[in-house]
Amino acid sequence: AFQKWCKKRYKTIDAVNEAWGTAFWAQHMNDFSEIIPPRYIGDGNFMNPGKLLDYKRFSSDALKELYIAERDVLESITPGLPLTTNFMVSAGGSMLDYDDWGAEVDFVSNDHYFTPGEAHFDEVAYAASLMDGISRKEPWFQMEHSTSAVNWRPINYRAEPGSVV
């Protein structure tokens, strides 16, 4: 699927080589069939940044297509009901281009989890600002939020009194 996405985006393998700077990275390709998803190298070397960026774009596009397909089925059997999916917008970034997704949902929503440390309030404000942009200043919803322990963090910190609204 990544090969097809690259072919649609770049049209020629030479355009891929140019965009990814494969001459510098000694990764020149002669055919779209030579394109593979990025792999962990494990020796401390960096992976090709152009390829990584395009793989993130591909991943976002593929997941958005799946969301649209599911949304369209739901719209056909539940007309008039608003549909959305949870975004995970944070300062940590994401593989998904949520700004591109914003127009596909009936309302924008976010999941946000308590981040231990001094930057917690800054991170919450940053994520909220991003959500304002994605929603084009329309109201947006907070779908999930942790007020205490989660099962996926090795150490959980309690929220300071008054910090959870």
Predicted regions and their residues:
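Active-site clefts of carbohydrate-active enzymes
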Residues: 36-56, 112, 127-162
